[in-house]
UniProtKB/Swiss-Prot annotation:
Keywords: Activator, Host cell membrane, Host membrane, Membrane, Transcription, Transcription regulation, Virion, Virion tegument
Topological type in the membrane: Peripheral membrane protein
Source organism per UniProt: Psittacid herpesvirus 1 (isolate Amazon parrot/-/97-0001/1997) (PsHV-1)
Spans annotated as Disordered: 473-540, 557-607
Protein name: Alpha trans-inducing factor
Start-end of Basic and acidic residues biased regions: 499-525, 598-607
Lineage: Viruses, Duplodnaviria, Heunggongvirae, Peploviricota, Herviviricetes
GO cellular component, one term: membrane
Cystine crosslinks: none
Predominant subcellular localization, coarse grouping: virion
Function: Abundant tegument protein. Trans-activates the immediate early genes.
Length: 607
């Protein structure tokens, strides 16, 4: 696939198609977002899986890598009724019964093998985080911090990138706290621990809520995934607020020797106030309302845990808004704590996004082109770009270190071998059942669309979608707008058109028969103005300003029309309004009336 990016128009070039990404559903998708969607699209091939192994072999492989409740017989019983779904209580019972966290066993094994190979420790991870942030502060904010941790030559570039990606899985409970007083320090660490427990519950809930068959049309599963996407998008905005608060704390410190650098809110275009950032308030928005509206019933435990995690992260960001770093040790501790919390949240969101991109995209409407999914990926791509954007040029700095690194769906699927084995088994089983029934599996077939079919689908959406308003927000990370959700505010009422107070007097004014009413209308601004002018004055006619030469031109045109009517044997009654045609409210002129105005004398002499 060849892509050609154009920042001015946002056009992606696909063989045979040229798509301009301007619509309400797809909301100004950046080029990197579509590239991410196309690259991460998992092409499911049940035929290839059945050629490599039999169905029984695929089932045996999946059973050895998955927890017992995933392939148990109790899961399929809930999909035989009219409303195929797994009850919320059953999912919670599976989550609470997984004391050993078997849902993440394969990922833990993969990352611990990597840690053993490269021999990395927690202190080195904190040094790496400080080195990355110090370099970013020097390049983008023009702030030279009094400490430098050199990481060049310690590990290879690929190993350093792997360390950043695996931080969430290897060191999830070792997020430090910035230097604060004893009560505040204890409250901060307690909040971080509670947030970590909430993330584990959300991840395990998503792991166990999957249906047993990819061809089952489960509305509740689609609603739960939509609520997860809203949660991920809101947390991406919280992550932006966290970096904004950390940048602002560094810029307020004494280490900023006259630099005019901006925090992330300056790049967004917002300004700071005494209670935090405008972006933080913008990111909170109506995420909770959208989650409750998406899952009104049937998923109470998941919804409450999502809201609890959002509230806990909001509290942590609020603590960072009031952070002060005036000493060298305070700055080192603050950077290590801020980067640790950011990597904790980024790893959590990366797990949820990859699970949706790999498994739950089967039950999403439009699959990989679902507007909520594209909005979530857009927020992640946009945040990564903003963290490397200079406040002077407003361009992404290619040499700035990437602060947030995460696996894509292809890498994650290779590491999460249990989910990959389950996907191969259930898709092969659904394919064989559909072949016996002489039909095509709809969801599996939709996951294997060609590039031309996907681009044609996008073009169809763009043609059917109305044009977005000019005042629509262009930042996907600073707003909680969701394309396929109803508007949170009612549309404004249409403007009330003003009507004339006295139609009868208005007609007399236009005919020039009521001079006193004309003067009165000129004083109070109601009605239309008559054309009583001199050569050096101007008038208002129908809300427009007309100069004296234009009025003389219109009077000459009126004289010509009146003379032509008299040549035909009739007469034409013109109101004293500068030669303008009479409105429908005016009475029709009488054919028996005679014109005695001074303007008609030249035509009378001519006749």
């Amino acid at each position: 696939m060849s892509t050609k990016s154009s920042p001015a128009r946002g056009t992606v070039y696909i063989p045979g198609h040229a798509m301009t990404l301007r619509s309400v559903e797809l909301k100004k998708i950046p080029i990197k977002v579509l590239k991410t969607v196309f690259e991460n699209a998992q092409k499911i091939s049940p035929v290839w899986s059945l050629e490599q192994a039999s169905l029984n072999s695929l089932a045996a492989t999946a059973e050895t890598m998955l927890p017992g409740p995933i392939l148990g017989p109790s899961r399929a019983e809930h999909f035989n009724g009219p409303d195929p779904t797994i009850p919320d209580k059953m999912v919670v019972r599976m989550v609470e019964g997984d004391h050993k966290m078997l849902f993440r066993a394969t990922l833990d094994d993969t990352y611990h093998i990597l840690v053993t190979r490269i021999r990395v420790r927690e202190k080195f991870v904190q040094r790496l985080a400080r080195a990355m942030y110090t370099r970013r502060a020097s390049m983008l904010m023009d702030v030279e911090l009094p400490f430098k941790d050199k990481m060049e030559g310690v590990y290879a570039a690929a190993d350093l990138e792997a360390i950043c990606k695996m931080h969430y899985w290897v060191f999830p409970h070792t997020v430090p706290a910035p230097n604060m007083k004893s009560p505040d320090d204890k409250a901060y660490l307690t909040s971080v621990a509670q947030f970590a427990r909430s993330t584990k519950f959300i991840e395990s809930y998503m792991y166990y809520m999957r249906p047993h068959d990819p061809e089952v049309n489960s509305t509740d599963t689609g609603n739960r995934v939509a609520a997860m996407l809203i949660y991920i998008h809101g947390m991406q905005c919280k992550l932006a607020s966290l970096f904004d608060a950390l940048d602002a704390a560094i810029l307020r410190s004494k280490f900023n020797a006259g630099s005019r650098g901006h925090s992330l809110s300056g790049i967004y275009g917002f300004t700071r106030n005494g209670k935090g950032t405008m972006m933080a308030a913008k990111s909170s928005g109506n995420v909770v309302e959208q989650i409750r509206r998406t899952c009104p019933f049937g998923s109470d435990a998941m919804v409450e845990c999502l809201i609890s995690a959002l509230d806990r992260m909001t509290y942590l960001v609020a603590r960072w808004e009031l952070m002060s770093v005036d000493k060298r040790d305070d700055a080192k501790a603050a950077i290590a704590a801020g980067m640790g919390l950011a990597w904790l949240l980024n790893g959590h969101l990366s797990y949820l996004t990859n699970m949706i991109m790999t498994v739950y995209v089967l039950w999403l409407p439009e699959h990989y082109l679902n507007p909520r999914l594209i909005l979530t990926i857009s927020s992640r791509v946009l945040l990564g770009q903003l963290l490397c954007t200079s406040h002077t040029t407003f361009r992404e700095n290619a040499t700035c270190p990437k602060m947030l690194l995460a696996q894509n769906a292809v890498e994650w699927k290779k590491q999460e071998r249990g989910t990959a084995a389950w996907l191969d088994y259930v898709c092969a089983r659904a394919w064989l059942r559909a072949s016996r029934e002489n039909r095509k599996p709809a969801n599996i077939t939709a996951m294997n669309n060609t590039l031309e079919e996907i681009s044609a689908h996008v073009l169809k959406i763009l043609e059917e979608a109305p044009q977005p308003a000019a005042s629509a927000p262009s930042s996907l990370c600073a707003t909680n707008y969701c394309p396929d959700s109803p508007p949170s505010r009612p549309p404004p009422p249409p403007p009330v058109q003003k009507r004339a107070k006295d139609p009868g007097r208005f007609s007399r004014i236009m005919a020039g028969d009521d001079r006193r009413a004309s003067v009165q209308s000129r004083e109070d601004g109601s009605g239309y103005m008559t054309c009583e002018h001199t050569a050096s004055t101007s008038t208002k006619l129908r809300g427009r300003v007309l100069s004296a030469p234009l009025i003389r031109h219109r009077r000459k045109s009126a004289e010509g029309l009146q003379g032509a009517a008299k040549l035909r044997g009739g007469s034409l009654r013109l109101p004293d309004n500068g030669g303008r045609a009479a409105l429908p409210s005016e009475p029709p002129p009488s054919s028996e009336s005679t014109d005695t105005s001074p303007e008609a004398r030249p035509e009378t002499d001519h006749k």
